[in-house]
Amino acid sequence: KEQKPRSFWMANTPLPLDILFLNSDKKIIRIHHSAQPYSEKRFPSGKPAQYVVETNGGFCINHDIHEGMYVTF
C-alpha cells in the first residue's frame, strides 16, 4: 500500500470512534476524537497516510495517546 491523503466517514457507524491516521512509519499523524455516529462529515488525514486505526470513542484520551506517537502491529 502507499501513503496518500485519506478520509473516513461515519455514515453507517452506530457508535463514536477515535480515528487515528498513521504514516508508513506507523507514526500517528492525525487523531479525530469521538467522531459522531452516523455523521456524513469527512474526517481527513491532513497528510499522506498509509493506515487508519479505529478505537472506541475516548480511547485515545483515556490512554494518553496523541499525535506524534508511534504504533506497533
Residue ranges, per PLM feature:
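Compact, glycine-rich, soluble single-domain proteins
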Residues: 1-73
